Amino acid sequence: MLKALGLGKRGGDMPTKPLNNSTVSLAIMDDALRVEEAFIAMDMVMDDRSKEALKLIQKDEPGSSGKSVAREQSAFYKLVIGVIYFIEATLGFEPESIRRASEALAEAEAAAVRQKRNVSNNGAHVSYSKYPPGTEYRVAFAEAELMGAITLFLSESYLESVKALYKLRKAYQTLDEISKSIRESKKPAKSSDHKSTLDSLSLAVSDDQEMASLVEKFQKTRLNRLNESNNATPVASSAASMNTTTSSATALHQGSETIEEFIESGVDLCFGILQLVISIIPPTLGKILSVVGFRGSRDGGLSLLWEATNYRNIHGALALLVLLQFYDGPTQFSDLILPGTEEDLIQQGKYDINTADDTEITLTATITGGSGHSKKVHTLPKNPRRRMHKLLLAARGYYPHSALWMLQQGRMEASQCHLEKAVDIMDADIGPIEMKQVEALMLFDKTMFMLFLNRYEQSATNFIRLIDINAWSHAWYTYVAATCSIEIYRENLRAGNAEAAKKAKDTATRLLTEAPGLIGKKKLMAKTMPMDVFLSRKISQMQQLSKQHNIDLVDAAGVSPVQEVVYFWNGYGKMPEYALEKVFSEVLAYSAAPLAPSHIPEQDNEKTVRHLLQAVALRNMGKVEEGYKILNDNVISQIITESNNKYHYNKTVTHKDPWMPPSALYERAMFEWVMHGPKGTETVREWLHLAEKWSDDYELSTRVGMKIKSAFERLDGGALA
């Protein structure tokens, strides 16, 4: 049957005879079955069962002579393989994973092009859905192109990056065209015409045994996927005896719905991602992309992604992951909180995600395509975290074996300042984790939350464990473990536990000595990782002080190094009050270790960093005026001078911590916002501009710059809270 459709051999892209109605009906069901099986396989991937997914789509079929169906025929199957390798590549950044993903996605692209060509060569005048013939293959092609472009960007090659832009442009144009078809199909006449066509096709196969067998298999597969338990065992159904005209018509309609689901959810996801990403990249890059046809709309992109979450398939799951990253990612970490938002209620301790308003807001969003603009009314959740929470709980049910969704649930709890609950969720045992990259991500996030809770012993142990399960950032993990050990050493000094203090000190010394030798083992885009640059400078400064004053390396550490890490990861905004109290009263009360045998006076640069961290901690404790005074009197005065009612950079002071001055200027802006709210917007902007213009490039400039950019977006109304 597949050979009759021109799908059964490599030469299947050659012209064949036009399809008759009976063959078109069989083709619809066969296509729909492949999509359903691909959906199930990709659900398995989302449930951390990639091996099962590969086994499902690479099984042999009767008459296939032992050859893999996935390798010879289905673009949808090849897309599944591409998705599996793509996830591995983007989570691990390993060269071999990137190469494998690129090859698999290239095969998926080629298969989609070949099968789209088959449809044209066969002269099919009847579409398998309400969209033009072969649209499902165009969507598969666009998905493969989009993932392939991202994979090429990871290859660290200029030539590959140029190829990636070309792929992105093709994917964008394809999705733009299909998006127009989808909007056109919403017209009542179109749907009615397609329904009549399907009804007439069913008459041609009312007694066809091959059709009956295909219908039975399709409906069992479809029911299996739609079963919320996501059990891989096929669900028994009444489809086994479906061989009447009525059942054929029903099956054809269901098959058409499956194909339409793939098309619509795929476009919502992929075009939504493109629209959103293009809208939030830096303006300079955005202008360059617009010249070559890329145009984005944040609201349009978000609305498409929210629409995609209505589908119970891989596209809906990935859309939810993107939304979780958008709302609880970098923009969520902004300290500039708008009044009346979810974040405002969270900060006040008045937010209950289970009772939050679940209504929607209506807006006119501009969907921007290569041929111009079109306006469309969309609804977005008034409280997106409430909606995401419900979807996330459903995803945990759909994918019970996956640590990926446990990770997302933990992150969501942490974003609401429920650190203990987040750690408890991530501590739950769900059995072995197949995706080691997800295991590493969850362990890292959980360990950072423990760090925010001042659990230094557990954190140190976990950072060392991360070295064993993650190929990246070994120098950074070693350094942070060392900073935890330094804090354990100081805690034991305060408690008078000499033996425990010595043990922690020895561990910290060993780790600080090892960390520099691990720098450069892994690079991103051929550059040393920013945190590696930071830790190299920090350890070098400790070594210089150690030699200069003839003291132990650990006693030259200065202000709590682990609290610098907490600050870089926006930990103060998530800490419970008791953790903040301890940090302020004990950890940030001094630099270095006054009780240590080899204590030296506090260095000027260490004192400045300590005062900056104290000020931020106090603001998050609600002691705004006290924090403002510490920041203004002890930090800002060394960075900024004022004359003629204008601020100027103080060039007379040399700063040994390059990240500190722009960070302090940013924090000054945040104090203005907390103290004066929207009334102080102009002053807030002034301080943000000072932070933004401090320097084009400095240590951790990307991390600090993201916070500054996020604050500007909030002020401009450019980010949904």
Swiss-Prot record:
Gene Ontology terms: cellular component: cytoplasm; nucleus
Keyword Transferase: no
Matching InterPro entries: Iml2/TPR_39
Residues making up the signal peptide according to the UniProt record: none
Keyword Nucleus: yes
Alphabetic keyword roster: Cytoplasm, Nucleus, Phosphoprotein
Domain of life where this protein originates: Eukaryota
Short name of any one Pfam family annotated for the protein: Iml2-TPR_39
Compartments where located: Cytoplasm; Nucleus
Task of the protein: Inclusion body (IB) resident protein that interacts strongly with lipid droplet (LD) proteins. Involved in LD-mediated IB clearing after protein folding stress, probably by enabling access to the IBs of an LD-stored soluble sterol derivative that acts as a chaperone in inclusion clearing.
Subunit structure: Interacts with lipid droplet proteins.
Family of this protein: Belongs to the IML2 family.
Protein name, entry field: Inclusion body clearance protein IML2
Organism from which the protein derives: Yarrowia lipolytica (strain CLIB 122 / E 150) (Yeast)
Gene this protein is translated from: IML2
